[in-house]
């Protein structure tokens, strides 16, 4: 069981942030501005895509309100930094912190 937990934590902290940010903020944020998303600069701002990506991101997570706040932070980082590095690091830090909390407090409901 400890090995399974270790793999879960590694996945949550390293794999999930990269994959989710590539989808939500690299692809979908641009796609909602222009379906030919490759023509949209990373971090380009439009209210509709900003709000839509945050809401859809939150709907995909267990804790909607908390995910709204996380989505606002991650999306704002992409827009201000014009890149994914900051939001991937923030997302990884969030997931690592949550994972360590879940393990140390045995609060498996958060996973």
Language model segments and positions:
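Transmembrane helix-loop-helix hairpins at the membrane interface
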Residues: 1-111
């Amino acid at each position: 069981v400890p090995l399974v937990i270790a793999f879960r934590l590694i996945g949550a902290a390293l794999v999930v942030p990269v994959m989710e940010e590539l989808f939500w903020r690299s692809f979908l944020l641009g796609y909602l501005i222009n379906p030919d998303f490759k023509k949209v600069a990373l971090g380009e701002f439009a209210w509709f895509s900003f709000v839509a990506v945050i809401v859809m991101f939150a709907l995909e997570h267990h804790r909607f309100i908390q995910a709204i706040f996380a989505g606002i932070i991650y999306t704002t980082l992409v827009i201000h930094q014009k890149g994914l590095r900051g939001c991937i690091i923030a997302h990884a830090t969030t997931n690592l912190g949550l994972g360590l909390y879940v393990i140390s407090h045995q609060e498996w409901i958060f996973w």
